[in-house]
Amino acid sequence: MIKSVILAAGKGTRMKSDKPKVLHTIFDKTLLGYIIDAVNKTGLADENFVIVGHQAERMEEFLKNNYQNAKPVLQSPQLGTGHAVSMVVPYLKDFKGQVIILNGDLPLIRPETIKEIIEFHNSNGSDLTIMSAIFDNPTGYGRVIKNEQGHVEAIIEEKDTTPEQKAVKEINAGVYVLNWEKINPAFAELKSDNAQGEYYLTDIVKWANKQNMKVKAYILKDNEELFGINCKAQLAEATKMMNRRVINKHLENGVQIVDPETTWISPETEIGADTIIYPYCYINGKNIIGKNCKIGPFAHLRGDVILEDEVKIGNFVEVKKTRMKSHTNACHLSYIGDSEFGSNVNIGAGTITANYNPLTKEKSKTILEDNVKIGSNSVLVAPVTVKEGANVGALSVITKDIPAWALAITRAPLRVLECWVKKHLE
């Protein structure tokens, strides 16, 4: 098994936020979460070390609540990327395996890419492997300098390049795989004699070459994975990139998405073939949508939603933490939360599941069994169960369980006051 080191100590000043950069979200999942999950999905890492610094306590709390195999390691003061990695040296004194180092603001990197760079490292017998990319316009990036045998000799920051080096289009992508036992002594020998007075991680390349070690570069196949996030504009752009990636996957798997430009689907949503997603839908969090469903237009699924086959969620319907069995419809203007619906259930327009008690701050469940019909503009006050086949009349407020095959009506009887308007106009 390998270890990962994820660099996440920075503040992210350009984000203009009180929140650490890596705790900003795409589809309600943090940038840091995407990186940790990508590493975990490879099945190769048994431990992740996350370097924290800015708002360290907040970062530690996030890791404690969400990632049990991620250990926060404090970097204080923050003296550069090389210094950051050196913070894990005491934790890996006897470790003889491999370590992968990644930046915490690369949410688009795929698990497959992480596996590939590790396999590349092993198949080439490298001591140190860096991830690189070929850019037509490499301006602003450090250049990867190789010898005639294709071994990496150095990573040179652009401001320090010669004209010949500046013409190189292969850049440093900021991901490293190293044989820990061989490379970790480098961190004690890094120097801060540069304009920033920092210890650079890139200097381990020169160190390894001085020790006659083998340093290779794995060239990234899809440069989009390298897209880093330093400001809110880049966060928005990364969200678009991820969304397009997700949509393309669903299109390839037989889902019909009428307008990909106005449809947003989280990476953790599963959708069955022949389901149709109409324009202006926002599907967030973890969801499972079956086959031959119809979603939208203007629908919002907020996470933990399971829709079995041939379910319809129509325009201006919001659903969260709900399971609906097959052939159930909620087609118009409804809020459905914390619910379980059977099959062949029909939800009339304007129906609300009142799931939240503001006094106790608790949420309760609404259960509708098979073949239940709910009339328009009804409110189901949870906790409540409507048994099989029961009907609820329009404009009803349901606060008690309804027995099977019953009709429940709570609205006031109709009153007609003849000539009332005419009398008031006289």
Cite the ranges covered by each PLM segment.
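Catalytic-core segments of class I nucleotidyltransferases/pyrophosphorylases
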Residues: 153-240
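Rossmann-like NAD(P)H-binding beta-loop-alpha module
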Residues: 133-164
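Conserved N-terminal catalytic core of the sugar/cofactor nucleotidyltransferase
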Residues: 31-102, 108-112, 116-119
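Hydrophobic targeting segments
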Residues: 2-6, 32, 47-50, 231
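Structural signal for interior beta-strand "rungs" in well-ordered beta-sheet cores
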Residues: 256-410, 414-415
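Short aromatic/basic micro-patch
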Residues: 25, 108, 177, 228-229, ...
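N-terminal nucleotide-binding beta1-loop-alpha1 segment
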Residues: 1-17
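Conserved donor-nucleotide/metal-binding helix-loop-beta segment in metal-dependent transferases, i.e.
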Residues: 112-139
